[in-house]
């Protein structure tokens, strides 16, 4: 039997040592600060949910709609409206978490070698996904207001003036940033939107923590 040598992309994934380390500390009495683990008492009653699901097995044990359950998509539309985002059910695609969503965004918007704007530092798992997409990085430092948008503008202008490759995508966690904990100011958010319109790149926002706060408005 011939020995099969893994492709270089698979070989790079196989060297990932982050998942075992996180998994090893995700249980027991340890408080895991390296991932978005919820407080156990706030988790849903999975036994009650399982009983309800069994009673509705004709619906729950079949394939669901391709873009997600209609009721869920409508709920997401209403949730977005709280932040002034106008959307319709047809604009919503339900995915299996942020990692799945970011991977899909990379497949849609990026070609190997394309530049992606990220904060320095940025979410470690996002780095792995972007590397798998063979993206290059334009890393922008942060201060207490989040990503330095003035510096980002200068970097973008330099690339444009020198005929360099322009970024196609920006990834950030603007609320309680992982790993810094910084929340981006409203002024910086407006700056980012203006830059995206001027320099024609897509903003991918990872926003799991926006409404989990002890003080202030989201």
Where are these regions (language model features)?
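Conserved PLP-binding active-site segment in aminotransferase class I/II-type PLP enzymes
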Residues: 2-12
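Intrinsic-disorder/low-complexity coil detector
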Residues: 5, 19, 43, 164-166
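N-terminal small-domain helix-loop-helix segment of the aminotransferase-like
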Residues: 10-97, 104
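Conserved core of the PLP fold type I
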Residues: 59-199, 210-218
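Glycine-centered flexible beta-alpha turn that most often forms the glycine-rich phosphate-binding loop
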Residues: 206
């Amino acid at each position: 039997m011939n020995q099969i040598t893994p492709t270089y992309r698979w070989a790079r994934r196989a060297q990932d040592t982050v998942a075992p380390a996180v998994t090893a500390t995700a249980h027991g009495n340890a408080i895991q600060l390296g991932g978005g683990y919820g407080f156990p008492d706030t988790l849903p009653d999975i036994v009650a949910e399982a009983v309800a699901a069994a009673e509705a097995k004709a619906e729950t044990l079949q394939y669901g709609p391709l873009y997600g359950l209609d009721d869920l998509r409508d709920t997401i539309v209403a949730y977005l409206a709280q932040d002034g985002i106008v959307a319709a059910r047809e604009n919503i695609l339900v995915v299996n978490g942020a990692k799945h969503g970011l991977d899909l965004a990379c497949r849609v918007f990026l070609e190997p070698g394309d530049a992606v704007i990220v904060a320095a530092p940025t979410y470690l798992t996002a780095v792995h996904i972007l590397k798998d997409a063979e993206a290059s990085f334009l890393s922008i430092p942060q201060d207490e207001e989040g990503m330095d948008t003035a510096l980002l503008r200068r970097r973008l202008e330099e690339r444009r003036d020198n005929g360099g490759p322009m970024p196609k995508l920006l990834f950030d966690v603007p609320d309680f940033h992982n790993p810094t904990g910084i929340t981006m100011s409203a002024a910086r958010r407006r700056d980012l939107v203006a830059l995206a319109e001027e320099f024609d790149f897509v903003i991918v926002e990872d926003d799991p923590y926006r409404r989990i706060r002890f003080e202030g408005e989201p």
